[in-house]
Amino acid sequence: MKTYNKLPRPLPDFAIALTGFAIAALGFWTAAWPSLREDVSANANSLASAFGLGPVDADFVLALLLSAGSIALAAAIALSAYRGFHNGAWAGPKPSPDRSYGNARIISSPLALQRRFKVWKRGEKSQPGLVVGGVGASRNHLLVAPIQNALIVGGTGSGKTTSVLAPSQIALIESETPVSTFTLDPKGELYNLTARHAMESGAKVVMIDFSDSKTSDGWLPLQPAIDCAKGVNGRRPDEMPAEIRILASTLIPDRHESSPIWTNAARILFSGLSAFVASSERIPDECRNLSTVAALASMPQETLQKITEELPIGSSSRQQLSAVAFAPAETFGGFATNLNAALDPYADPSVSPMLSRSDYRPEDFAKGRVCLYVKFNGGSTALDALVSAFVSQTLETLRRVAERECGGRLPRPVYCLFEEFAQLPKIDGMQKHVSIVRGAGVRMVFVAQDRSQIESVYRSEAPAIFNNLDTTLFLSSNDLKTCKHYSEALGSYTVETVQNSRTRGANTGSSTQSRTLHEARLFRPEDLAKWDWQAGHLIIDRGNVYACSSLPLSKTFAGDLIGLGGEEADAAKLAQMRPERPVKNLLPAPVWEWQGNDKATFGEIAAAISGVGDPRFM
């Protein structure tokens, strides 16, 4: 199988072949030529005389012929090797010029790659985009695709981080055009590798760490709702319901029951309590957090009944909550248990400190360069919904800021590198985000082990997401469905088969030659299943297929920029590169305590529930 990590080199190959032919010619000159010289010279002069020419210097003619022959043969061999390697196929037979059954080709020659993609060279600033690979074994050149939205398909061990994401993060930091980044970084590797470099470049670096909250920057999920309630930072009170519904639809999971009444009631109650906490003058500012919402949500059944009775008669919220508030005690107990189980992780003292204040706001992207990293525990799903809510809230705010404050487009493009995107809970409206925010200057790169992961999470919305992707980087896949999809998408080419046959008679014989054309897939599913980092990277871009090298970060000049010096970044090296972060989240989030016997508060919570409305329709 071919590997695009090491390409044929026409000039060196030509030089090697020429050296071999020169040695052979010299051997002929010294060993065989002396004995042949007189006869050849006599015949040559005789032939020259017949044409009216003068005497011939046989030594000169032979030297000229040997030189020209050696050069021609060496050039033919080098060119044949180069064309054979870049013939447009990988594992299949040589393509035919005929197009009867298709003309799909892999574009892999260095010149063609450098015409299509931006080339980031050592010592120069990069162009913003996704680093899709390199040019052969050269550590001094990287290819950058100026993408809108992209998908990276790569299974475990495919080199997603070391050959694509880390070089891309560095390229964006080094971009000639200032850009910002929003990176989902499950294991924290990208932060360890690139954060110090980002700081030194002058970018604001933010780390939201859901796996170790003690050193995390703060993120207050209710901050947008609080801003709406207060009418600050360009927000209006009438926008608060939409902000709260982002949290409700993500943090309160759909239980997939035969009747959605329990999920609806939980989301309505959560939304109303969140609106109350965000807006009520009874709540001190330091207590406007999810811990207070969780504490209120654990109210006894009698308290919920009193709040429900304050809701307008006939309203959807009253109907939904009445089914829970006035249910038998055992039924209400199950509802309360499920609601508390959904909210307790966010009120846990190990997490609540980082959720009680905001050190970062999405609006910061409009003010200057930001490198935002989000780390979460890939081995635990306890806080995955919170990560999804963070992503949804950030994207929605970026869109709003672009529309209202920046004339429709952010002053600096924001590149979102979403690693392990498909392992997070579904982000409501993602198919809309993908299509809408690109106009605001937001570029998204989704990273998944295969297409089936995204389809299983987003189901009917998955095609809309895929249709808004203009570039796919295929690293590897063990998923048969994914391999079949790309096998069909990459098309076919025409193969020519020549058959010779000979017949013999008593006194004569004859031979015939037949030429047959047939179809061959550019990649069969089994070919794609064998493709991995040792072969290179496949880039599917606007109907064309490109193949380039997949060198790890340490083998490129991008690794030199962050101090790898040609060495792999093992655990010790990553720990050394990671910026020091102070411990700043030790005290649990402050919680407002309510005794539950204040009629005025019942009415205020009921008004908040009515004001937020029914989140099912959002």
Where do the protein language model's features map onto the residues?
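Basic- and hydrophobic-enriched, low-structure N-terminal and domain-boundary segments
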Residues: 1-158, 162-170, 175-177, 214, ...
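Polar low-complexity intrinsically disordered regions enriched in Ser/Thr and small residues
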Residues: 23, 105, 126, 132, ...
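Short, solvent-exposed helix-helix connector turns and helix-capping sites enriched
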Residues: 39, 43-50, 240, 299-300, ...
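Low-complexity, polar-biased intrinsically disordered regions enriched in Pro/Ser/Thr/Gly
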Residues: 117-123, 231-235, 252-259, 283, ...
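N-terminal short leaders/motifs
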Residues: 122-137, 313-330, 495-499
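P-loop NTPase motor domains
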Residues: 141-442, 457, 526-547, 551-555, ...
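Conserved ATP-driven motor cores of ASCE-family P-loop NTPases powering translocation/secretion/packaging/pilus
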Residues: 434-436, 440-538
